[in-house]
A protein has these predicted regions:
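Arg/Lys-rich, low-complexity, intrinsically disordered basic segments
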Residues: 1-118
């Protein structure tokens, strides 16, 4: 398996997070028809398969995802934004990144999901 520049969150993890994004109206396009999640689900959450799924003739979904993540991480860094709010919940931008199967804090995501179960 080739290494992706930005590690993918597991599809099972994203499936648990998606209802929160939906409730907050985050990442409607990524979650919608023809969006990132539909494609990620179509390859059964296999990151290596995303490079074989084409967004345009010249760009695959893996590259599109990397571009999205780079833009949002740059904004987080530039604006010194936290990715978790004062209550320990992901910010809207962090949720958006998760809907593209990425988090700069994957262990924190798992801990947050565990807390939500309680």
């Amino acid at each position: 398996m080739s290494k992706n520049f930005f590690d993918y969150l597991k599809l099972s993890t994203i499936n648990k997070i998606e209802p929160v994004a939906e409730e907050l109206s985050v990442s409607k396009v990524a979650r919608g028809p023809g969006g990132f999640l539909e494609v990620y689900r179509s390859v059964r959450g296999r990151p290596d398969s995303m490079k074989n799924q084409w967004y345009t003739e010249r760009h695959n979904w893996n590259k599109r995802r990397e571009g999205f993540i780079k833009r949002h991480l740059a904004q987080i860094q530039k604006q010194d934004e936290p990715i978790w709010d004062e209550n320990g919940h992901p910010t809207r931008r962090h949720l958006a990144l998760m809907m593209w199967a990425y988090s700069p804090d994957p262990e924190g995501v798992l801990s947050w999901l565990d807390e939500m179960k309680k």
